[in-house]
């Protein structure tokens, strides 16, 4: 009995005769490496290759501050460069820009605004306001490609004057006030350029109220967006 058990164990552990020699002579397995073509990188735009998912969506779901604006700037410039690589005659693809923010820095707002205007010389930016679009976020919503700006039915919009919180001696405060006044003028000019507000109407509203709240219908009425989703 013991011999039969040992024999079975040996048969299980040891390979059949001839198999060991064959495995030594067999060539090593090869690894197939597949290159990613330019067509795939461009979502199949340059040929008939199956398109990879073409994600051209960016989003601002935080404060308007330098680190986030740096990320969005890099993304916009990259997506615009991808459009430049398309062959002549191919339709350029837009970028969808979702905005949901309480606002933030006026300087960073203008940094993003200027980049958007530069990119839109070649690539459409479809802005989409959801949730809340307030303070510095309102200009970014309005700055999208005209006719392609959307807003959620339940989105809240809020506009107010440029604010600052620096303190110091009188000369510093005077200097700071002059800078804020210039920034305020630039903000009003940009809003008038990108919305249906007249300068007189916007200045009147800003002087009457600390915060101006608009619902989706009012945002479309005043030209911050073109349609409600």
Model segments located where?
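Terminal-region recognition feature
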Residues: 1-229
């Amino acid at each position: 009995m013991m011999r039969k058990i040992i024999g079975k164990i040996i048969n299980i552990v040891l390979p059949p005769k001839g198999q060991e020699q064959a495995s030594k002579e067999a060539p090593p397995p090869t690894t197939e490496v597949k290159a990613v073509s330019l067509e795939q990188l461009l979502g199949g735009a340059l040929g008939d290759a199956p398109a990879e998912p073409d994600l051209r969506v960016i989003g601002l779901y935080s404060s308007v501050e330098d680190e986030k604006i740096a990320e969005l700037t890099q993304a916009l410039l990259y997506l615009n460069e991808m459009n430049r690589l398309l062959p002549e005659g191919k339709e350029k693809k837009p970028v969808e820009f979702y905005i949901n923010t309480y606002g933030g820095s006026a300087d960073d707002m203008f940094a993003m605004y200027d980049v958007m205007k530069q990119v839109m010389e070649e690539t459409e930016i479809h802005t989409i306001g959801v949730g809340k679009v307030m303070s510095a976020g309102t200009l970014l919503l309005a700055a999208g490609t005209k006719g392609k700006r959307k807003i959620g039915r339940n989105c809240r919009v809020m506009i107010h004057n440029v604010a600052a919180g620096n303190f110091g001696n009188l000369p510093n405060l005077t200097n700071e006030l002059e800078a804020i006044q210039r920034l305020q003028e630039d903000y009003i000019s940009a809003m008038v350029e990108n919305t249906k507000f007249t300068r007189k109407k916007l200045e009147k509203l800003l002087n009457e109220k600390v915060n101006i709240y608009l619902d989706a219908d009012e945002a479309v009425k005043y030209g911050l967006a073109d349609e409600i989703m």
